[in-house]
Amino acid sequence: MKIEVCNVCKQFKKVEVLKNINMVFEDGKIYGFSGRNGSGKSVLLKIICGIYSPTNGEVLIDGKNYNRSNMFVPNLRALIEKPSFFPDLTGFENLKLLAQIQNKITEKEILSALEIVNLIDEKDKKYSEYSLGMKQKLGIAQVIMEDPKVMLLDEPFNGIEEESVQKISDYLLKQKKKGKIIIISTHIKEDLKKLADQIYYFDNGSVK
């Protein structure tokens, strides 16, 4: 799979938040987006996964513009902003409900995803009882259980303890070896230096 960001610009109320961005993402690599909050990195992730459309330019996935065709992007899953689940269901029940919609994810795969993010011991707690870090872990587990070809992760380690960060990082490195494309956006440079093959630095909508 190949993702091409071609001359992408994005404006909100005449404020230009992305300026003529060009990037190429290829199989078997981890890419990092680094920069201050509001620098444009999260906006680009949302454009790549189809939440936003670019004001100008295009994103091509294997040569196809899904933004323009308004189609669901296959084999791509994203953790964008704060994950959202049903508060009165447990972590496991939330993932099981999503798995039933997918109709191809087994209970074993759900439990494996929870194990990877160190949430297996809290799987039977209600989501409303989860801490910020636990909620973040559940969002990552959702992406993991769906086993996509492309993973977009926005501030994935926010509120997560070091032991779990290391475990999730090890998983991501294994997925890279399997040929997956992984894009991680974070303002914490140290997280990216340990994982990313290439880091893009965002500053006021431009990339260095």
Give residue ranges: language-model regions.
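Helix-to-loop junction immediately C-terminal to a conserved catalytic motif
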Residues: 49
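Conserved ABC ATPase "signature" region
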Residues: 96, 107-122
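The feature captures the beta-strand-to-loop junction immediately N-terminal to the Walker
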Residues: 34-36
